[in-house]
UniProtKB/Swiss-Prot annotation:
Source organism (scientific name): Arabidopsis thaliana
Keywords: LIM domain, Metal-binding, Zinc
Keyword check for Oxidoreductase: no
Gene that this sequence comes from: DAR5
Protein name: Protein DA1-related 5
Highest rank taxon of the organism: Eukaryota
Pfam families: DA1-like, LIM, NB-ARC, RPW8
Amino acid sequence: MPISDVASLVGGAALGAPLSEIFKLVIEEAKKVKDFKPLSQDLASTMERLVPIFNEIDMMQQGSNRGTSELKVLTETMERAGEMVHKCSRIQWYSIAKKALYTREIKAINQDFLKFCQIELQLIQHRNQLQYMRSMGMASVSTKADLLSDIGNEFSKLCLVAQPEVVTKFWLKRPLMELKKMLFEDGVVTVVVSAPYALGKTTLVTKLCHDADVKEKFKQIFFISVSKFPNVRLIGHKLLEHIGCKANEYENDLDAMLYIQQLLKQLGRNGSILLVLDDVWAEEESLLQKFLIQLPDYKILVTSRFEFTSFGPTFHLKPLIDDEVECRDEIEENEKLPEVNPPLSMCGGCNSAVKHEESVNILGVLWHPGCFCCRSCDKPIAIHELENHVSNSRGKFHKSCYERYCYVCKEKKMKTYNIHPFWEERYCPVHEADGTPKCCSCERLEPRGTKYGKLSDGRWLCLECGKSAMDSDECQPLYFDMRDFFESLNMKIEKEFPLILVRKELLNKKEEKIDNHYEVLIRAYCMSEQKIMTYVSEEPRTGQNKQLIDMDTEPQGVVHECKVTAILILYGLPRLLTGYILAHEMMHAWLRLNGHMNLNNILEEGICQVLGHLWLESQTYATADTTADAASASSSSSRTPPAASASKKGEWSDFDKKLVEFCKNQIETDESPVYGLGFRTVNEMVTNSSLQETLKEILRRR
């Protein structure tokens, strides 16, 4: 269907068009908008999650006027989404200003969808619950709470976990340990155990539920068999029977689900909960979302033949290989295998089982003695050498081997070497001039056996930095987060201007190097326009024939006419480095937009470096996966803080954490006479007073 027809259909939503069908059409068109990824995909993903929920609500409101119903706000937001998708599909590639504006509008629409789910929908549900309780003869929520206060034991009988076999299956030892580790991770709320039919999914989670560590962590463990055709009303009926209430008929599955959610919230007061949903089919993904409620110490474990990537991390239970099958058969014949308690530990090197009495403990990780080897000589590192051994991102070394080991060419007998001041990697001096690629982001040289990526302008990028290298679309959320960051510092930037990623040739044409002595590569430029006017610097005198002579004029920039037109940043850099550079240039923009021109060069560059350093510090404490505000309608409705995740996908890696420290170290140890001296001077001023007082002092020292 053409996008114009979709927009027309959306506009007629209030006239009776099926809401779920409108959702699907807008979703289909949003996925086709390529110029606004990943925001358009986030919008489509949000609407896909809303379809099953609001389809049920719409059915319940049949015969009512949608224009005055509870879905009015949703319908209006849907109209905005349809219009915006229509506009985005027609935008030209060169319309940078419109693209930035539309990006923010898409983000606002997405937030409005979430706000409806997180606030208004919750109030609607609460009202429906009160109405339902009155129909059952319950006076108030407190009456219901009294009935639920002592049902913890009865409910555990209803959802009792089957007793495990006395003999522990040999092939479940490792999966049991790995699944328990995944479930216990902080921040993990849901885990999906996925495997083909008859591979032992239910057996595995049954063992897990009876594990001593799991029982200690979760005070209440409930096991629900979902199957292909789940009966939500039946579950609700059984719950009512166990609290002594009459099992009234529900109007529909939605009423039953609302009751189950309320019951889980009440049970949450009795302690931590592990809810196991066994044998969930692909058609019931919407049912899983309904069990996602905000409770402390509440986790969900799902078994399925399918994967639910939007629901949570997946644990893949793998089939046995031939050797394991033979071993399993022999053990089952004996039926004398002891229980898995305590579990075996895994070697940090070969990732196989290791006994405590036959292992070496290195910083809390057990190793086979033969697996803890030197990267240079391939010989084991003895126990008495552990205290002096060297361990870094390239491997583990004997101290004597490390002092002679080149991490580039693997030469084991270097007579002289260079060492990187931050990464502490030693290499032959010849690699500085023999054409060995150096990453333009982290400055590490390319080791033999790896392959750095070469950008179109000749720069090199290592594999780690390349994973989070940003393109223009991915920079837009970072740009808006940066504006929020400045606003949080009471330095709001009112003017809208685009952020553009460009090649290095364009940047070097736009701006000369400030530190010519140090040959700094220009990585960004704040473009601005300044009104130049001529003013009289000295009064004229009258000469012969009454002619005016000696009238001197000089050009003068009119500050209040200054405009920032764009920020240009070198393309191909990872998110952390791009963000630091953007913070630096945004400070230049703030100064110019507020009329602060012709400042002391060292102090101006210094305050810009301080802002970049402050932003990097905010990233040091950022939590992983903060881009999940569109992943679930049950998440918090507050705006995502400026401290976002390091990578494009939102996951923090060990390298991301190290790269933050590297960028901060680059600023702190810079020896250039402008950037380096400027940072240290201004940073000391901020430390001794405040950011706002430092700004006043810089403006005073024009």
